[in-house]
């Protein structure tokens, strides 16, 4: 097993566990798994998460109904349902967690969107799709889990049509991040490094893509993990026994690592947009 495969397997095992599924489903509101954009510090996580999706959609608002979109690392599929409902896009969800994918399919059925959204089990390092299949690629806070981010970008390039756009968010390290500063965060997600704006721009340039913008929102990373920690502490007892006490205690430690890393000045988060000529 390669290192990238091992990282992917760890991500799958983690998100498929009962404790992780129960935690994310209850705390995030059942639709999303990504970082929210907050107007106030005590805003519901669900509302902030939807605001992130809406803001990313603004970056691709010129695409018409019927646009083919691929969501890489789609989680519970909340973003796909938003795009299908509000923009009429046809969305394919690719995700490594079988548990999340089942929830995704179930909600699509319940919300009458099964004809607009397809859900695929798999890794974004080896996409099960034909070349030049999609108009738009989308990803939220997922690529960090890859042990081979360059391969993810190469696969994205393969399935994206000429004239297409790639919009994504990802918790990143700054381009000048000293070695060791983010170790507590990296150890938690079993990685040696995070991506960076410079890294993604460099790979995109090598692929012949055009950099469109980076909508920098790093402060929201701190806002988000602080809000999740508040909710965990407020609902600690109710989350058990669905989530084990050991899991919740580890999550508290991990959330504090993310908050401290975000405040360190060596993390970055926001919306990146690239265009493939």
UniProtKB/Swiss-Prot annotation:
Effect of residue 171 to Q: The Vmax value is about 27% of the wild-type when dimethylglycine is used as a methyl group acceptor. Glycine and sarcosine are ineffective as methyl group acceptors
Domain of life, source organism: Bacteria
UniProt cross-references to SUPFAM superfamilies, sorted A to Z: S-adenosyl-L-methionine-dependent methyltransferases
Matches recorded under InterPro entries: Erg6_SMT_methyltransf, Methyltransf_11, SAM-dependent_MTases_sf
Effect of residue 172 to R: Almost inactive
Site (Important for dimethylglycine binding): 171-172
This enzyme's EC code(s): 2.1.1.157
pH dependence: Optimum pH is 8.8. The activities remain high at more alkaline pH but decrease sharply at the acidic side of the optimal pH.
Regulation of its function: Inhibited by n-butylic acid and S-adenosyl-L-homocysteine.
Metabolic or biological pathway, per its Swiss-Prot or TrEMBL entry: Amine and polyamine biosynthesis; betaine biosynthesis via glycine pathway; betaine from glycine: step 2/3; Amine and polyamine biosynthesis; betaine biosynthesis via glycine pathway; betaine from glycine: step 3/3
Catalytic activities: sarcosine + 2 S-adenosyl-L-methionine = glycine betaine + 2 S-adenosyl-L-homocysteine + 2 H(+); sarcosine + S-adenosyl-L-methionine = N,N-dimethylglycine + S-adenosyl-L-homocysteine + H(+); N,N-dimethylglycine + S-adenosyl-L-methionine = glycine betaine + S-adenosyl-L-homocysteine + H(+)
Gene Ontology molecular-function annotations: dimethylglycine N-methyltransferase activity; sarcosine N-methyltransferase activity
PANTHER family, A to Z: GERANYL DIPHOSPHATE 2-C-METHYLTRANSFERASE (PTHR44068:SF11), ZGC:194242 (PTHR44068)
Subunit field text: Monomer.
Record's function text: Catalyzes the methylation of sarcosine and dimethylglycine to dimethylglycine and betaine, respectively, with S-adenosylmethionine (AdoMet) acting as the methyl donor. Activity with sarcosine is much weaker than activity with dimethylglycine.
Record's protein name: Sarcosine/dimethylglycine N-methyltransferase
Naturally occurring in which organism (per UniProt): Aphanothece halophytica
């Amino acid at each position: 097993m390669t290192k990238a495969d091992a990282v992917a397997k760890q991500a799958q095992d983690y998100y498929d566990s009962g404790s992780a599924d129960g935690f994310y489903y209850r705390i995030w509101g059942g639709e999303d798994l990504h970082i929210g954009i907050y107007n106030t510090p005590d805003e519901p996580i669900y509302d902030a998460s939807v605001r992130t999706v809406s803001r990313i959609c603004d970056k691709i608002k010129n695409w018409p109904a019927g646009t083919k979109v691929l969501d890489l690392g789609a989680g519970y599929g909340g973003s796909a349902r938003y795009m299908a409902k509000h923009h009429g896009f046809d969305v394919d969800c690719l995700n490594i967690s079988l548990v999340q994918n089942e929830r995704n399919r179930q909600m699509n059925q319940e919300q009458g969107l099964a004809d607009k959204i397809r859900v695929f089990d798999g890794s974004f390092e080896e996409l099960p799709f034909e070349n030049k299949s999609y108009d738009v690629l989308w990803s939220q806070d997922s690529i960090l889990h890859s042990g081979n981010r360059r391969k993810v970008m190469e696969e994205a390039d393969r399935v994206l049509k000429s004239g297409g756009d790639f919009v994504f968010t990802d918790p990143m390290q700054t381009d000048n991040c000293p070695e060791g500063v983010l170790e507590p965060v990296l150890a938690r997600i079993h990685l040696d490094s995070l991506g960076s704006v410079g890294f993604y721009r460099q790979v995109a340039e090598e692929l012949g893509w055009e950099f469109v913008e980076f909508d920098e929102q790093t402060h929201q990373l701190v806002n988000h993990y602080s809000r999740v920690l508040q909710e965990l502490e407020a609902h600690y007892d109710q989350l058990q026994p669905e989530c084990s006490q050991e899991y919740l205690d580890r999550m508290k430690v991990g959330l504090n690592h993310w908050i401290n890393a975000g405040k360190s000045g060596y993390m970055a988060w926001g919306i990146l947009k690239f265009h493939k000529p």
